[in-house]
Structures are given as structure tokens and as C-alpha cells.
């Protein structure tokens, strides 16, 4: 049995401080056959979580301690003409635009959110945080 307590969280924060990425993952899966996303992530201010998405599943973000923003993005597609008057080629350019910022802080009663399937997102850590 795994207990999520102050001792475990303090240990994760200490390991995150030693990690150049300023974060530490704790895998809570109990077997190799378990392919679920069962992990704790200790995140320190300054960590960079690349903007990413999960095309086939939602992501539940539960903040156990700390303060952070979950930032959601949408794809913006633009088509531009490249070339001269003799040969025109159309280039497809994809960019991401921030559409929503969800502030999470358990002491303010804001415990988590659900990121929709396929939604681009990242986090901005305001103070040391642990998410499940």
C-alpha cells in the first residue's frame, strides 16, 4: 500500500531540487501490466513542461499542494503563399494560442481540473506543487 503523506511529498520536493528539470515523478503503478497514468509529479517554480496533448484520453489534474496554472491552447492554422509570380506554393503553418488559464490552489478551494481529450496544455508553477 502506498500512502501519500507529508513525508512522501517532502521527499519528492527534495529530489526535484536536485533534478535539473526542477521536477520529480513518483510512479504509483503496482505492476508492469498497469498502463494507467498513476503518478505524482512534484513541480518547482521554473520547471518547463512542454506544451503537449493526449489525443486519446482526458487528463485529470488534481493539485495536492502548492499553486499553479493549467494553461490550455488551441491550434491556429494559417496558409501563406511562398514563391514568386512564376511558381506559387502554399505553406501550412500551425501555431498554438492560449485560450484559457485555470488557477489551481487547494487553500483557495481550487483543487483540480479535467483537460479535454486532444487539448494542448501545459502548467506554470507558481509555488512548489504536487499533482496527481
Residue ranges and their predicted role:
Residues 23-26, 36, 46, 56, ...:
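Short beta-strand-initiation
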Residues 36-38, 57-59, 110, 128-129:
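Short, surface-exposed beta-edge/turn micro-motifs
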Residues 40-41, 52, 58-63, 113, ...:
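His/acidic/aromatic-lined binding-pocket segments of jelly-roll/cupin-type domains
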Residues 56-78, 83-89:
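Glycine- and acidic-residue-biased ligand/ion/polar-headgroup-sensing regions
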